[in-house]
Curated annotation (Swiss-Prot):
InterPro entries documented for this protein: MTA_SAH_Nsdase, Nucleoside_phosphorylase_d, Nucleoside_phosphorylase_sf
Active site: residue positions: E12, D198
CDD domains assigned: MTAN (cd09008)
Extent of the signal sequence: none
One Pfam family per UniProt: PNP_UDP_1
Entry GO terms, CC: cytosol
Organism of derivation: Shewanella sp. (strain ANA-3)
Function: Catalyzes the irreversible cleavage of the glycosidic bond in both 5'-methylthioadenosine (MTA) and S-adenosylhomocysteine (SAH/AdoHcy) to adenine and the corresponding thioribose, 5'-methylthioribose and S-ribosylhomocysteine, respectively. Also cleaves 5'-deoxyadenosine, a toxic by-product of radical S-adenosylmethionine (SAM) enzymes, into 5-deoxyribose and adenine.
Protein's recorded name: 5'-methylthioadenosine/S-adenosylhomocysteine nucleosidase
Length: 236
């Protein structure tokens, strides 16, 4: 079993890379891919860069060059669920674009033309993540809708509009739906694991800078615990 792990920023992958053994690296198109062992599993970890295009490039290269059995997207997010605090975790129940609008042609808001409205993670990956929750200690984790767009959300007016479109949204970020769409295209199972760095409000820029390391660590911890729960025979 080989698992691809993608984070956008250095704090989102640093703890994973530090915990790897037998690591070797290869750089393709300016993106470093580090292969090795983590939590007893063969993994390839990469820092994609920020945003949907960067994430799509990294995911495509990862799948084409390393043929992972599954892909995990890890990192930080802005929180929308009232039950969560900074540092808590959202496991994707589904992933959607929040900045796509081709409703003029009969698609749902957030649905890219000729694509599903929502990208659904592999049940066995979500199950492993849920099993890992018990080991998180005081960090809370829930399943929920994660939405993606090429904007850092800190405007209350925009937040209100997003919640009108996606009332069950638990978190938003800038890569997950792009990674999910590429995985969907290639038929590769995925899950998105995000820890909250801010609450998508006026304080978000300050909160993000203050808490990105904490969020990156919590998300990385969740990924490592998830890997420990994975049964190599469960790939489907």
């Amino acid at each position: 079993m080989k698992i691809g792990i993608i984070g956008a920023m250095e704090p989102e992958v640093a703890h994973l890379i530090a915990a790897m053994t037998n690591a070797s690296s290869q750089t393709i198109a300016g993106i470093e891919f580090i292969a090795g062992t983590l939590a007893g599993k063969d993994v390839v970890v990469t820092r994609s860069g920020i945003g949907k295009v960067a994430a799509s490039i990294a995911t495509t290269l990862l799948i084409e060059k390393y043929a992972p059995d599954a892909v995990i997207n890890t990192g930080s997010a802005g929180g929308f669920a009232d039950s969560l605090s900074i540092g808590d975790i959202v496991i994707s129940s589904e992933v959607r674009h929040h900045d796509v609008d081709v409703t003029a042609f009969g698609y749902e808001i957030g649905q890219m033309a000729q694509q599903p409205a929502a990208f659904i993670p592999a049940p066995y990956l979500v199950e492993a993540a849920n099993k890992a929750i018990a080991q998180l200690g005081e960090v809370k984790a829930i399943e929920g809708l994660i939405c993606t767009g090429d904007s850092f959300i800190c405007d209350p007016v925009r937040t209100k509009t997003m919640l009108e479109h996606f009332p069950t949204m638990a978190a938003c970020e800038m890569e997950g739906a792009a990674i999910a769409q590429v995985c969907h295209q290639f038929g590769v199972p995925f899950v998105v694991i995000r820890s909250l760095s801010d609450n998508a409000n006026n304080d978000s820029p300050v909160d993000f800078d203050s808490y990105i390391v904490k969020a990156g660590y919590h998300s990385a911890l969740m990924v490592m615990l998830l890997l420990e729960q994975l049964d190599p025979n469960s790939v489907k």
